[in-house]
């Protein structure tokens, strides 16, 4: 096999303010699940750097839950499609697909024998359904609510009971199978966000936007108590999760705290303050074995520490929005990956362990369009907030210095030796030296899109939307047009010089990569065909003999310079999402990013 996936650094959960986010637990205790966009992400709970991504939904996925057997996962999307798929094989073969109702699926529950499934949400004609997993035959009706149902759970032993919570401020109680509506529970005064039965089935809890948690008898549905008296939290409660022994309950709230409750004596055991920023609101939680997890509005996943509630054991960071660009850099003998997303967030990853964090301080306020590292070890990034930033990679701190404000929005940035930076903006090319503007070409007569600086430092290539590449010379503090026009096969989308400066590779919207030989006066060396859609990005391998290209067709090709027929094709590198950026860690390791907000490392063998 010429390529192999080496590592997957998965995206964070996709979160929305005021909406609870479900973390699905694994009955075997190894993994946990959540969703982002059209992906379901499975991560190892002990080592979250180990991840797997399921991408077979055509629409945004909202919730995914393991069957109690652990062999299947059911996932539901905004169109009302429920897919049940295999967890034991890498291919995740589809077992069954159902459409219980037309509209967003918000929660899923299985019976303990993994044979029946309840699905609730925002259907047009009904808000829930309960059916056999293998035939889809109905095993009851979910009625009793007049608004969208947010949550459902089923008692995990016989006699079965089912509970739901809805935006009509009520919970409902059902007996079955076949499941029949018994009564409505109207104790809450706001939306009911979450209902959960304890693992032993003796009790169930409801949590609401009114800040209250009520405990009920699991068999009869009678009220037992209100946790914490009149208020369990100062804000709305979005999620609850029982401890494996059914004695304690974990709750997550918009008041930016999570709490552990001793249900038997009705008291708070610990409170976890998660911060003071609005992004620290807690939208989801999971108690699995010894792990207590919560999700913040920032998308970060917190591992809570019972022994030290004020500080999480670890926080999983990353991206929850699409990644636009990446670059790599060696620092202190380690290779790091830097990725920038369309919300202005820049993250750095240890390429071996997947340990990652974001830069401290206030950075870009809009999409990061392009990043590169200059000779002094600074990350140079340009963003739709009309700035170019220079960030020290040893400190990884956005300082007030190192920000260059531009007149128009930058699209691409490239650096050369001697402190030079060239920025391509809308209708403008800007030359910076030592972080200061020294020259600009204001009306170049074409629309510049991308830029590359020759490793020698004296030549700049600018690709335009007119399908041409123009060559400029850096002379002191000016840029001089050399009058050279290199023709690509379509609007130029990216270009790069090989590390030895011998070749310039240009990719375009017409699905072609053209390589020019620099020493021969930029004569055309070779043309590379293979992509089925617009090529977005390219990167040279350190060996100067291979280069990779990624496109809207979700494919990555690794090309051999001397022979266009010798190529490695990575199909569906990021399934359902186009490849947004590429970089090489070494001659055999390629890093790709995509709008699925994940980073992948591939081992390439020739």
Curated annotation (Swiss-Prot):
WD repeats: from-to residues: 4-45, 48-87, 93-135, 138-176, 180-218, 224-263, 270-306, 311-351, 358-408, 432-474, 480-518, 523-561, 566-604
GO BP, one annotated term: positive regulation of actin filament depolymerization
Keyword Phosphoprotein found: yes
Protein name, entry field: WD repeat-containing protein 1
Top-level taxon in the UniProt lineage: Eukaryota
Subcellular location: Cytoplasm, Cytoskeleton; Cell projection, Podosome
Pfam families hit by this protein: WD40
Lineage: Eukaryota, Metazoa, Chordata, Craniata, Vertebrata
PANTHER family to which the protein is assigned, alphabetical: WD REPEAT-CONTAINING PROTEIN 1, WD-REPEATCONTAINING PROTEIN WDR1
Regions annotated as coiled coil: none
């Amino acid at each position: 096999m010429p390529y192999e996936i080496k590592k997957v650094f998965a995206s964070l959960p996709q979160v929305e303010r005021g909406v609870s986010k479900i973390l699905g637990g694994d009955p075997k205790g190894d993994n946990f699940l959540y969703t982002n966009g059209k992906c379901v992400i499975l991560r190892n709970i002990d080592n979250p750097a180990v991840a797997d991504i399921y991408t077979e939904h055509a629409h945004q996925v909202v919730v995914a839950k393991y069957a109690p057997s652990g062999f299947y996962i059911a996932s539901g999307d905004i169109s009302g499609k429920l897919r049940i798929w295999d967890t034991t094989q890498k291919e995740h073969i589809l077992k069954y697909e159902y459409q219980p109702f037309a509209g967003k699926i918000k929660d899923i529950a299985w019976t303990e024998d993994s044979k029946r499934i309840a699905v609730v949400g925002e259907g047009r004609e009904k808000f829930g359904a309960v059916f056999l997993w293998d035939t889809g035959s109905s095993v009851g009706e979910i009625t009793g609510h007049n608004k969208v149902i947010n949550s459902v759970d089923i008692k995990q032993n016989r006699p079965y009971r089912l509970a739901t919570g809805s935006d009509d401020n009520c919970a409902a109680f059902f007996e079955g199978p076949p499941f029949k509506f018994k009564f409505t529970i109207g104790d809450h005064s706001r939306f009911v966000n979450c209902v959960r039965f304890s693992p032993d089935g003796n009790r169930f809890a409801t949590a609401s936007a009114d800040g209250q948690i009520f405990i009920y008898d699991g068999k009869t549905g009678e009220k037992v108590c209100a946790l914490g008296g009149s208020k369990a939290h100062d804000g709305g409660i979005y999620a609850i999760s029982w401890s494996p022994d059914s004695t304690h309950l974990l709750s997550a709230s918009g008041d930016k705290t999570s709490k552990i409750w001793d249900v038997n004596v009705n008291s708070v055991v610990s409170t976890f303050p998660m911060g003071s920023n609005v992004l620290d609101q807690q939208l989801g939680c999971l108690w699995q074995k010894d792990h207590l997890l919560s999700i913040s509005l920032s998308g970060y996943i917190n591992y809570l520490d019972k022994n030290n509630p004020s500080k999480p054991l670890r926080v999983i960071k990353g991206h929850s929005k699409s990644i636009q660009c990446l670059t790599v850099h060696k620092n202190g003998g380690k290779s790091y990956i830097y990725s920038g997303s369309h919300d202005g967030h820049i993250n750095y990853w240890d390429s071996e362990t997947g340990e990652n964090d974001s830069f401290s301080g206030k950075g870009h306020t809009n999409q990061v369009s392009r990043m590169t590292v200059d000779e002094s070890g600074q990350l140079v990034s340009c963003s739709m907030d009309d700035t170019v930033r220079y960030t020290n990679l040893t400190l990884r701190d956005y300082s007030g210095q190192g920000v260059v404000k531009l007149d128009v929005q930058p699209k691409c940035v490239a650096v050369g030796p001697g402190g030079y930076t060239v920025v391509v903006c809308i209708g403008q090319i800007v030359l910076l030296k030592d972080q200061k503007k020294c020259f600009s070409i204001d009306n170049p007569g074409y629309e510049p899109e991308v830029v590359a600086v020759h490793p020698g430092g004296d030549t700049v290539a600018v690709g335009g939307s007119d399908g041409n590449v123009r060559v400029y010379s850096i002379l002191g503090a000016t840029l001089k047009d050399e009058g050279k026009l290199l023709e690509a096969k379509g609007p130029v989308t990216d270009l790069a010089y090989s590390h030895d400066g011998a070749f310039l590779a240009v990719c375009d919207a017409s699905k072609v990569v053209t390589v020019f030989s620099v020493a021969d006066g930029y004569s055309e060396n070779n043309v590379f065909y293979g992509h089925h859609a617009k090529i977005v990005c390219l990167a040279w391998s350190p060996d100067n003999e291979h280069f990779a290209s990624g496109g809207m067709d979700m494919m990555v090709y690794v090309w051999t310079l001397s022979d266009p027929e010798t190529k490695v094709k990575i199909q569906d590198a990021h399934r359902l999402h186009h490849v947004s950026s590429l970089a090489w860690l070494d001659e055999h390791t390629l890093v790709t990013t995509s709008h699925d907000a994940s980073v992948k490392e591939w081992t390439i063998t020739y």
